Amino acid sequence: AELVEDIKNQGKEIGVEVEGVKVNFPQVIAHKNAISKQLTSGVAGLLKLNKVKKVDGEAAFVGEKRIRVTKPDGSAEEMTADAIIVATGSVNAVPPIPGIRENPNCIDSTGALSLEKLPESMVVIGGGVIGLELACAYAAFGTRITVVEAMDHMLPMLDGDLTKIGVAHM
């Protein structure tokens, strides 16, 4: 998306005029998927190289330095460590908006990164970092974007000065 934006906006400054820049959106998604697969396998290789043990399952604390992991097959394993880091990633928040769960056109950020067709228009609910990243990327591809934010300014979780800088670069 950034490359398309650069070609459209900055090319003229350096004497490059390009007519009819076209985005092949299915190819963009295929490229994104290939990179994602490469990164995932790279992480697996790093874990193996560094002799990191990976255990699939759900953890529960059973002591100050002890957890019990229930594996997908139902078996359990207890582990002890001097430090336990909870780094489980994030889950998309689904706000209490009437009809949101029943609407097939309502997608989360993961779904937005997996669309097969570039939409002509898009409403992004939430003016936080992820919402604005998606809004800017899709706008660069040519989608008409509207961002809905409940707070009185975009990027409400950031410091006011950072918010001004971020919004100025949109």
How would you name each of these model-derived features?
Residues 131-132:
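N-terminal Rossmann-fold NAD(P) dinucleotide-binding loop
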Residues 125-128:
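Glycine-rich Rossmann-fold phosphate-binding loop(s) that bind the pyrophosphate
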Residues 135-140, 146:
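Gly/Ala-rich phosphate-binding loop of Rossmann-like dinucleotide-binding domains
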Residues 1-118, 146, 151-155, 160-169:
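Glycine-rich flavin
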Residues 122:
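Conserved class I S-adenosyl-L-methionine
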